[in-house]
């Protein structure tokens, strides 16, 4: 379970970084899932 959670967090971070790099607004649901 921990490995799956780490992969999920890593994927979310990568998605957020890509969105910021492209200058796109960050999806609120992505932020919510990061916060728990």
From Swiss-Prot:
Residues 24-25 form a propeptide. It is found in: Secreted. The modification Glutamine amide is found at residue 35. One of its GO terms (cellular component) is extracellular region. It comes from the Eukaryota. Residues 1-23 form the signal peptide. The keyword Repeat does not apply. Venom protein with unknown function. Does not induce paralysis when a high dose is administered by intrathoracic injection into the blowfly Lucilia caesar. This is U14-myrmicitoxin-Tb1a. It comes from Tetramorium bicarinatum. Keywords: Amidation, Secreted, Signal.
């Amino acid at each position: 379970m921990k490995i799956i959670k780490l992969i999920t967090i890593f994927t979310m971070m990568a998605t957020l970084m890509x969105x910021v790099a492209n200058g796109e607004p960050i999806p609120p649901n992505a932020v919510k899932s990061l916060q728990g």
